[in-house]
């Protein structure tokens, strides 16, 4: 009679699919070529009646040696395999399963005929996995193929077997001792052959399919009479069987698709959506949408740099809300809000981080509430909010102790972040963060709104590697570089329409989006915050890198502009930066109390005088012309 064999079962740990999804997103992308993997069969402490089972986990994508190092010594056999992961479910369904199995089995036959299987007998257990990963729904369709090579052997005798099992799953027995199977070349095919096999099946009278492949290899080599010592962990079920080949084999029939638990041929489905923590699902989903950009459109996009960027949002209103949401969409994980206001009833419809409930009881603090609501959107974001007033140039000090604390806290926040967004209502509120950003070599992105216009710009940054006298060369200007007067109080004695941000609702969305996109583009440039203005589409992997973007809704036009820094700027000139570094709060306090101080420090006063003299000379020359 012929020996009986039992099919192998696959047990795939969820970590295998997590690793597969990572590889698909980051490495494989659209590549559908086969990738090597490894699995292992336990052969120790098998339960009675247990069928052979191959196990895979996240380490299955590493080398066989690394996988073996994670297992107890002498407890499992490592086998090599391959996984073919296709891009669509339709391809998974339409792929010819016969061709796939034949190709996988052909590799085993090739290893037999070129004698590679003698050097590495584990090739006889080579397996293949055909899969599709639905990364949006976290569903993984997969089907294992265990190529089984058929040959016809009949058992001529059978009996119990004693003694210890060899260390190797496949051995040649010579002089009663196991030796490497590679020595089979020295055994004539007409001689009786004695081999040993360590079985991974605990089913009585049914052996692992790998024994069938072993016997088929011997048949291909021309052996007709074989004695096999089949060792099992339960020594009482170990057997010695003598077999005789019934017909020669050259191109054996191949079978081996795994059956379902119902005994039917068909793939399995692993639904990890119900197993993974919802916060981790959200984290992976954000990364999924971003990493898909790298598959075809922007392969060299540096997402890790964007993700690691720490962003400080000064202003948590309309612009701050939209900037925060856009940063989340780009995968930024550290976002800090600063504001001194509370949520009012007019805010939620224009500021998407607030709800009606945030307006009750006098209104919740804007900064803290914005941070809390960001966490409701994405729990793993590191969002914080701080209520503080930014000291404003031209606004006299009213409470020095509190304002000094706000100054110190703002300085700490600027130092601890990479990008500073200026999103406040008033012009003078932006002065101190502009100075601090330059002092700390930070990327500063400024967004300002008009009724139907907007300005988005990145500030030029003083490069510490350049000498002071070289700082004027090619450095881009800041928000204040077009001013010939130092910032002063622009909020006092305003009517209601001047105090509120009166703008077409869509303007804020446009400006906020452009501000975040400008930041992302800057981060892709090798010079980052020191990058020059460029209108060339090849400047970064995302295209051009402008200095300023000015948009107008009345004619739906946007201009890309550039302006060098102003030598006498009240916010970014070398004299202001040096004075801030040397005097700190005392310098700021003097600027708050006396706007003329900044003009005197920077040389704007002299500019005014020269302008007046030029105007006077022009008037005199005109007057003299009247008497000619």
Curated annotation (Swiss-Prot):
- What family does this chain come from, according to its entry? Belongs to the ATG7 family.
Task: Give the multimer and partner information.
Answer: Homodimer.
List keywords of the entry alphabetically: Autophagy, Cytoplasm, Protein transport, Transport, Ubl conjugation pathway
Catalytic site positions:
500
- Per UniProt, the short sequence motif GXGXXG motif occupies residue numbers 315-320
- Identify the Pfam families for this entry: ATG7_N, ThiF
Q: Which GO terms describe its biological process?
A: autophagosome assembly; autophagy of mitochondrion; cellular response to nitrogen starvation; piecemeal microautophagy of the nucleus; protein modification by small protein conjugation; protein transport
Q: Which domain of life is it from?
A: Eukaryota
A single Gene Ontology CC annotation of this entry is: phagophore assembly site
GO molecular function annotations of the record: Atg12 activating enzyme activity; Atg8 activating enzyme activity
Gene name? ATG7
The main location class comes to cytoplasm
- State the protein's name: Ubiquitin-like modifier-activating enzyme ATG7
State where the protein is found: Cytoplasm; Preautophagosomal structure
User: Coiled-coil segments, which residues?
Assistant: none
Q: Share the domain note from the entry.
A: The GxGxxG motif is important for the function, possibly through binding with ATP.
Function noted in UniProt: E1-like activating enzyme involved in the 2 ubiquitin-like systems required for cytoplasm to vacuole transport (Cvt) and autophagy. Activates ATG12 for its conjugation with ATG5 and ATG8 for its conjugation with phosphatidylethanolamine. Both systems are needed for the ATG8 association to Cvt vesicles and autophagosomes membranes. Autophagy is essential for maintenance of amino acid levels and protein synthesis under nitrogen starvation.
